[in-house]
Amino acid sequence: MAPAVMASSATTVAPFQGLKSTAGLPISCRSGSTGLSSVSNGGRIRCMQVWPIEGIKKFETLSYLPPLSTEALLKQVDYLIRSKWVPCLEFSKVGFVFREHNSSPGYYDGRYWTMWKLPMFGCTDATQVLNEVEEVKKEYPDAYVRVIGFDNMRQVQCVSFIAFRPPGCEESGKA
């Protein structure tokens, strides 16, 4: 048998005519001889602060806030659970990225912390996570503890924040 030949209907596309004219677009009013409009934030500039570049180490997502209270931690962990992320706990005595033996990044430069037990798959209650944080604090009182929200569908870490700082660390984040 001979193969059937189908007639395809070709659609014509209009040829490219170049960019459209901007003559129909509104022109913003320009004042002054420089052609730039003056933008002012008014009195709001006086209340803005710049984060110091020396002496204060930054941690995770919520590091610019004061230490989280138990209620605030519960709310953050509850958000993590409602977002269908798996809570994980990690701890480290250093808590910062550092390069001690080599100038290139590697496994032992502080980016990877030790995981506490296993990820809490199936966890539905934020108090379960905080109970585990308390266990880490008892076992390693001089270690930083962070909570991680892991999305097991996309295989990515979605959120990470410090849940506990050791007593030797000042509350502002100074080491």
From Swiss-Prot:
Membrane-spanning residues: none
Gene from which this protein is expressed: RBCS2
The UniProt record lists the keyword Plastid: yes
Transit peptide start and end: 1-46
Subcellular location: Plastid, Chloroplast
GO cellular component, one term: chloroplast
Assembly, per entry: Heterohexadecamer of 8 large and 8 small subunits.
Disulfide bonds: none
Function comment: RuBisCO catalyzes two reactions: the carboxylation of D-ribulose 1,5-bisphosphate, the primary event in carbon dioxide fixation, as well as the oxidative fragmentation of the pentose substrate. Both reactions occur simultaneously and in competition at the same active site. Although the small subunit is not catalytic it is essential for maximal activity.
Species, as recorded: Triticum aestivum (Wheat)
Comment field (misc): The basic functional RuBisCO is composed of a large chain homodimer in a 'head-to-tail' conformation. In form I RuBisCO this homodimer is arranged in a barrel-like tetramer with the small subunits forming a tetrameric 'cap' on each end of the 'barrel'.
Protein name in UniProt: Ribulose bisphosphate carboxylase small subunit, chloroplastic 2
Family: Belongs to the RuBisCO small chain family.
Main location (coarse class): plastid
InterPro entries assigned: RuBisCO_ssu, RuBisCO_ssu_dom, RuBisCO_ssu_sf
UniProt feature coiled coil, ranges: none
Keywords of this entry: Calvin cycle, Carbon dioxide fixation, Chloroplast, Photorespiration, Photosynthesis, Plastid, Transit peptide
CDD domains: RuBisCO_small
Keyword Plastid found: yes
Pfam families: RuBisCO_small
